[in-house]
């Protein structure tokens, strides 16, 4: 009897731990940011890796939830680690088509082989399937129409193009 009970408990616990969670969050597409950049300022090698500051000089915001333009004046403060991974920390702002200014802080990673990273650095068009570029943007909007952006978690994919960075943003549901 004890062995049967132990077997049933073991079977149940194995079954319980192998089930796929049913409460995985969904995603809702918000917009695409096309961010224009100037050439980087290269600080050089630091204890953390190669520091680069990439000025953000403009761009567009298009999507079902928000539209507008990226304003001049932001930057991406990147560290390229010894393993070649670029740690991204971008701070910039957008202006919606109805005149609202929204601050963005975007933290992420771009992972590529040394060969792919060199092609990206030279400004070549590289298929985004050849590298991993993901980030977590945080929006800070004033009270009003875009206040919903203050109370949500977002994720994004990135694509480095020769003349911009394309960032597709989803709200985590």
Where is each model-derived feature located?
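Beta-strand-enriched cores of mature, soluble protein domains
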Residues: 19-173
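Bacterial Sec-dependent N-terminal signal peptides
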Residues: 1-22
């Amino acid at each position: 009897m004890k062995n049967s009970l132990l077997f049933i408990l073991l079977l149940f616990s194995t079954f319980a731990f192998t089930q796929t969670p049913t409460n995985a969050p969904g995603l809702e597409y918000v917009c695409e940011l096309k961010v224009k950049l100037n050439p980087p300022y290269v600080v050089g090698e630091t204890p953390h890796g190669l520091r680069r500051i990439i000025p953000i000089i403009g761009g567009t915001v298009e999507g079902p939830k928000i539209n507008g333009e990226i304003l001049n004046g932001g930057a991406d403060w990147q560290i390229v680690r010894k393993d070649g991974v670029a740690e991204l920390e971008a701070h910039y702002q957008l202006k919606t088509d109805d005149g609202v200014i929204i601050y963005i802080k975007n933290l992420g990673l771009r992972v590529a082989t040394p060969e792919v990273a060199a092609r990206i650095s030279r400004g070549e068009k590289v298929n985004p399937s050849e590298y991993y570029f993901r980030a977590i943007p945080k929006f800070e909007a004033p009270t009003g129409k875009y206040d919903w952006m203050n109370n949500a978690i977002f994720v994004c994919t990135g694509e480095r193009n020769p003349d911009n960075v394309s960032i597709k943003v989803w709200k985590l549901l």
